[in-house]
Amino acid sequence: MGIFSETVPITAVTTYIDRLTSRDTDDEDLSGIVQLSEAVNLTVTGPREASRTLRKKLKYSTPHEQVRALVILQALIENAGSHFLQNFSDEKLEDRMLQCATNSEYSKPVRKRAIHMIKLWHNDYSNVRGMESMSSLVSRLPQRQSSASHSEQPTINLKKVGPILERLIASSSMAATNLSNSLVRINPNTENPAKNKQIMVYYVDCKRAHRSLLRYIQAIQDEMWLANLLKANDEIVTAIDAFKEKCSENSDYSSDSGSYSSSYSRHLDDRASYISRSSSGGSNAQRSEDLDVNNPFGDHNRLE
């Protein structure tokens, strides 16, 4: 090793990524993402190590491993939190993503997924701290690619997506319960909910779940699943509305909480609209963040 070579720490982050990109994993398998996210957040260098390892997978690995690297990258963006978002991006990763999207040496599934991810970042992450450069990559795509890729309708396989929906409904219910219970325990006249870090964590969880629910409500036609998704969405909306009501009751909310909330949860895309409790389906659903970014109607097959 040369005297000017960078010393690269190898931790559990690299070990997890190696395991999650192995050839015996399914393309869309998201098991292990929670553990990887925790490992990334354990150290200051975790996000950069993850970025570097994924970039090398995209450059040197097989098509399957490249797809897996893209899956993991998007899952980390959506689940690893602000520490990852604000520290993972660099010029080398940006250039590699463009290569994945435009270079014919990459397989069609890799190119298609990379294009969808770049478009997603532009649509949903332009105002997210740490994602400024990644969200601007769309301007560097060839015009044909930057304007294409919405014509194909995703194929919905309920057998495959069923477990994902179950997890989403359960996690949404838990998020709504956590936020609602935490709001009951405070006095809005003396404590601003938007200044309570734990409440803000629950609020962020609800916002993420809400956008995922909207995406599935728009896509799912099965009446049983749709009813369960709408019920979960109602719980989330009730909790979020309660948070806003508590904030409005606080005497200094109008002057203080806005700046705190925006800085603490800046990564949220508040463009997502609430779906009415009386909605019969996905007609009012807006574009939203999908917890399972790589399922047939996830972010790489964006629903308009």
Curated annotation (Swiss-Prot):
Biased composition (Low complexity): 274-286
Keyword Ubl conjugation: no
Keyword Cytoplasm: yes
Residue span(s) of domain VHS: 20-149
Compartment(s) where it occurs, according to its Swiss-Prot or TrEMBL record: Cytoplasm, Cell cortex; Cytoplasm, Cytoskeleton
Keywords from the named record: Cytoplasm, Cytoskeleton, Endocytosis
Disordered: region residues: 274-304
CDD domains for this protein: GAT_LSB5 (cd14232), VHS_Lsb5 (cd16980)
GO cellular component assignments: actin cortical patch; cell cortex; mitotic spindle pole body
Pfam family, one: VHS
GO biological process, one term: intracellular protein transport
GO MF, one example: ubiquitin binding
Domain of life: Eukaryota
Purpose: Essential for the organization of the actin cytoskeleton, fluid phase endocytosis and vesicle trafficking.
Family: Belongs to the LSB5 family.
PANTHER family: LAS SEVENTEEN-BINDING PROTEIN 5
Protein name: Protein lsb5
Gene: lsb5
